[in-house]
Amino acid sequence: MNYNTTRKGVIGQEIVKLYLLTLNARVFEPVCDDFGIDLLVETKNGYETIQVKYHNCKQTKSVSSIQIFVDNTKADWIATPFNIDGQTKIIWFKNDLNKKKWGKSFSITKPMNNQTKNINFYWDYLKSPVE
C-alpha cells in the first residue's frame, strides 16, 4: 500500500512514541516541527531531540538495505521505524552531521560475499537514546 509523506510521518512518529513509552520514557511533542524535530525525550543527561524518518521497507532479492536521507535538522537523533519479517524495528542513530543534508544506508541482510567491514547492519542500531 502506498502512503503519502504526511501519512507515513504520522505513522512513524506514533510507532516511535509508543516504543519510547513502553520504556517508561517521558516523551514530548513540539507544537510545530518546522526545524525537523518531531519528538523530545527526557534522558539521564537532560533532553534529546528526535527526527522520525519512516521507511516502508520492501525486502526483495535485489534490495538488501534501507537508505535514509536527512535534510538540515537540529535533531540529536534520527529514528527510523520499519517492518522486517513481520516485526517492527526502529533504527536509532546519532545525528552528528546536523544542519547538513546527508544519507546513510543500513543493510537488512548479510551480504552474499560475507563482507562485514564498513557495513552498517540495522541490528547494530536498535538501541534508543533512553536505553
Spell out what each predicted region is.
Residues 1-35, 40-131:
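Mixed-charge (Asp/Glu-Lys/Arg
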